[in-house]
Amino acid sequence: SDMAATMLEQGARSFHEGCEIVYLIHIWQMIESNGHSFCYGRFDQYMLDLYEQDIKKGILTKENALEIITHMFLMNSSCNKVRPYGHTRFSQGYPLYSNLVVGGLMPNGKDGTNTLSYLCIEAMHLCSLAEPNFSARYHKDSPRSFVEACAKLIRTGCGMPSMFHDETAVAGLLSLGIPKEDALDYCPIGCVETGVPGKYGHRATGMTYVNWGKVLEIMLHNGYDPASGIRMLPYTASEEAFVDFQNYEELWQAWKTYLKFYSDISVQCDAICDASLAVYDADPFASCLIQDSLKLGKTLKEGGCRYDVISQSNIGPSVVGNSLYAIKKLVFEDKRFTMKELLAAMHDNWQTEASRKIHKLVKKAAKFGNDQDEVDKIVADVFYSYLALLSDYETLRKGKGPKVSCYTMSTSNITSYVPNGFVVGRSEEHTSELQSPN
């Protein structure tokens, strides 16, 4: 209570107070904005001065610091966000996506791994909880001991830390027009998005989720959704829910047509959501913590930030890639069955003897993530087919303050008939999450 009475006015005087302030600010932001993907950022970087100050004064030991960090992690997991059942079911409960990252390069290009980096890893060992969503940055000159510490934590089965490769992430940010010094200071947002702490806008992802597996399913059925019977974009003039593709090139062109159609719609939905959020959910407290917001006299949702970079949440690129490869290989190259036979097998959910034979062939087809170049290339093609669309998309905040304002790519599940099947081949079973292999 003594700390709470003074520390926000005079600033943190100790490592303990610094952790308290970090946690309080985190909680206030969650309360203001319904608690989704508010992240601690580069905790080991901005807390290092207080840690070293207290160690030098003799008022803190490494063991004390570990206890404080561990307690902060436990307190973070005491928070909750009530979600719809659909989200709870497919997101393993009630995740908050409160990302905390350690390690990696500093803005000056030097390695930033320090004692706090290791203490945070040890704290996650002790907690063994799903939150904070723990990440680690690494690069070619990262200390081997740091990479090994991360590997040992991953080996426990907790699934963390998520590993972010600096050379790759920094190059991606530079390609968006982010200055190198800021790009080197990036941190993960929520799960896999990257951004510049204290300078990014109000969200890293779009307000829409586009299930690419569903897009492929609709494409294969000539614009019909087989679950509802609704038809949105006919590919041919035929009323039949089937397209008799003659070769892979025709199939690929159809994919690009449908991807653009649904991506365009999702950007329009984003704009509708953004216009409402700017009026009804301004986030004044969070806006005060972002550079240029006060200078521009705008909230985050009006463009009060340095960089306004958002992405779509695109579900299942590997599902699409695996499916396209299976069709390319088994229908067009090996001619083991026809497109019509494949769709018939999916419609009866692989239950008949003939369908099970087709399913067996589909399951044996190469899958993304197994170092098989032909299918991996098709998955890469799927990614690039979306990247080619992004230059046409703008946010509502472009030209209203941010120095960089654009769309980029992100990659989240329910699809019925998609011919990628390994364990996932049947209707209403789960597909892979996000951009993960099946």
Language-model-detected regions and their locations in the chain:
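Conserved catalytic cores of very large enzyme subunits
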Residues: 1-432, 436
